[in-house]
Amino acid sequence: MTEISRQAYADMFGPTTGDRVRLADTELWIEVENDLTAYGEEVKFGGGKVIRDGMGQGQMRARACVDLVITNALIVDHWGIVKADIGIKDGRIFAIGKAGNPDIQPNVTIPIGVGTEAIAGEGKIVTAGGVDTHIHWICPQQAEEALVSGVTTMIGGGTGPAAGTNATTCTPGPWYIARMLQAADSLPVNIGFLGKGNGSNPDALREQIAAGAIGLKIHEDWGATPAAIDCALTVAEEMDIQVALHSDTLNESGFVEDTLAAIGDRTIHTFHTEGAGGGHAPDIITACAHPHILPSSTNPTLPYTVNTIDEHLDMLMVCHHLDPDIAEDVAFAESRIRRETIAAEDVLHDLGAFSLTSSDSQAMGRVGEVILRTWQVAHRMKVQRGPLAEETGDNDNQRVKRYIAKYTINPALTHGIAHEVGSVEAGKLADLVLWSPAFFGVKPATLIKGGMIVCAPMGDINASIPTPQPVHYRPMFGALGAARHHCRLTFLSQAAVENGIAQQLNLRSATAVVKGCRTVKKADMIHNSLQPNITVDAQTYEVRIDGEPITSEPADVLPMAQRYFLF
C-alpha cells in the first residue's frame, strides 16, 4: 500500500488517530482518539475525487442511501473525539462510521447513492448544536443571534420586552403560552417554553403545562417562597416536567436551608447557582453539593475577569427594574455581586461541580456567547490550574469533554429532551455545527438544522464564486418557507400532546415530548457530577471545599476575543 506523510494525509482527509488539534487561540488541545474511516478507502467529494458514480457512490435508490453525508469530520462530543463520516437521513443522524459504496468498498455503514448530498468535513470539527436553557424571550431576533453562535435549541419564557420578561424567564398563563407557541412556530431553532411557577394553587400551574409549557420557572421577582417551590415541584412530579429556580436573594422568605428543605429530594434546576444572577446571598452556591440539584451558570460571570464586577451593577439595576436613587434597591444589587463567589465559580466548573452553562439572554446575559464563554473558562482553568488529573497523554480531551457537555447533553438531560437533541448520536435530530479549528467556539463554518443547512457565512451574492467579501452569516434554505417547519422541533409536555395543543393552535412544526425530567439527578450529569462539601463564610464570602479555599485570579486577557471580531 502506498503511504503518504501524516501532514499530507491531514491536509487531504483531515486529522487522524494521534493527531492533535488546537481549539481557536486557546491553550486547549484535543487528540483524535479513533478514526472510523478506512485508510485507502476514504470518501471525498470533488473533481477527480472518490464520490463518483460507480466509485464511492453506489447505484441504490434514495430509500437505501443517506440524504446527506459529512465526510471525514472530527467529531467532538461528550462521548469521544473521533474522526468519522456522518450520515443523515430524514433529518436525523443515520449513522456515524464509514461512508461509501457498499458494492465495492468494505465495512460501509453509511451508503452513498444518487440521492446523497455531500458536505466536506475534512479539516472541520463537528459538534452537536448547543442547548441554552435560560432564555428571556425579550425579542425574537435572539433566535438568529443564538443560531449563528452554534446554539440550536432554546428553552425559556417571556412575551417580549415587558417588565416581567426583562426580569424573569416565564411565559405566564395559557393564553400567552398559546400565542408564544404560535409566534415561535417559524423560528429556525428548537423551542420549549417555561410557565410561571410562582403560585400556591396547583391548578394554576397545571393549566400552564396542559397548555404547552414544558416546565415551570420560579423567580424571586414573582416571589420564590418555600410554598411556591413546594407547589411547583408537586405539580412537576405529577406531570413529568422540570422546575427552574431563581431563589430569594434577600432571604426574606427563608435562607438557603429553607429553600433546600422545601425542595426535599425532588429534582430541580438551579439557575446561576453562583448568585450574581440571583439567589440566596451569599451562599446559594452551596446548593451544587446536593444530589437532586442540577446547577447551572449564566454567562455574564464566565469567565471571571478584571471587568466582571464593574459590569454587573448597572446590568442588574436595569434587568430587575431597580431604581439607583433608592438605597434599598442599590443594596439589593450589591448583595448579589460578590468577588469571592464569582472567583470560585470557574473552579467549580472545572471540577465538574457546576453542570450546565446558559445565557440569561438580554437579562444580564449574552445570547450569542454561551459557547464562546464556556471555552474561555476552560482555557482560563487550564492556564491557572494545569491539566486535569484525569487526562492521559499530551492533550486536553477530558477537559474538553467536560466543558462541551455543559451546553449540549447535560441541559438536554435536565429538561427531558436528550432523546431528541444534545449529542452527535444516531437517531437524534441532525442539529450539527461545523467549525474550522481556528474559529472553534467563535464563528461556525456551517450550521445544520434537522438535516438542512440553515445558516452559513456567505459572500457577495453577485460574485462568480461563493467566497468573495463581504462575507457574513445569511439564512439558508433550511430557514425558509415550509422547510423550516420540518427542520425544527417545538417541545411540549405529555399533557399538552394529549390535549392536542399542536392541532388546536395549528402549529406547523414537528413536535416532541419532554420526558424523564423527574428521574434525572446530579449523578446523571455527564462529566459534571461532582457533589463537593462546600461552605461560604457569611462575613468574608470565602468559598471552601472540604475546608480548603477555592478561588481564581481575574483574567486581563482572553482568547476567542478581539482578534475574532475586527469585522
Curated annotation (Swiss-Prot):
Molecular function via GO: nickel cation binding; urease activity
GO cellular component, as recorded: cytoplasm
PROSITE patterns: UREASE_1, UREASE_2, UREASE_3
Keyword hit for Cytoplasm: yes
UniProt-annotated catalytic positions: 320 (proton donor)
UniProt modification remark: Carboxylation allows a single lysine to coordinate two nickel ions.
Catalytic activity: urea + 2 H2O + H(+) = hydrogencarbonate + 2 NH4(+)
Entry's Gene Ontology BP terms: urea catabolic process
Membrane-spanning residues: none
EC number(s) recorded for this UniProt protein: 3.5.1.5
Taxonomy, superkingdom: Bacteria
Cofactor(s) annotated in UniProt: Ni cation
Subcellular location: Cytoplasm
Pathway as given in its UniProt record: Nitrogen metabolism; urea degradation; CO(2) and NH(3) from urea (urease route): step 1/1
Protein residues bound to substrate: 219
Record keywords: Cytoplasm, Hydrolase, Metal-binding, Nickel
N6-carboxylysine, modified sites: 217
Residue intervals of the Urease domain: 129-567
Co-factor remark: Binds 2 nickel ions per subunit.
Binding site for Ni(2+) 2: 217, 246, 272
Positions annotated to bind Ni(2+) 1: 134, 136, 217, 360
InterPro entries: Amidohydro-rel (IPR006680), Metal-dep_hydrolase_composite (IPR011059), Metal_Hydrolase (IPR032466), Urease_alpha_N_dom (IPR011612), Urease_alpha_subunit (IPR050112), Urease_AS (IPR017950), Urease_asu (IPR005848), Urease_asu_c (IPR017951)
Similarity field: Belongs to the metallo-dependent hydrolases superfamily. Urease alpha subunit family.
Quaternary context: Heterotrimer of UreA (gamma), UreB (beta) and UreC (alpha) subunits. Three heterotrimers associate to form the active enzyme.
Name used for this protein in its record: Urease subunit alpha
Species per Swiss-Prot/TrEMBL record: Citrobacter koseri (strain ATCC BAA-895 / CDC 4225-83 / SGSC4696)
Taxon lineage: Bacteria, Pseudomonadati, Pseudomonadota, Gammaproteobacteria, Enterobacterales
Gene behind the chain: ureC
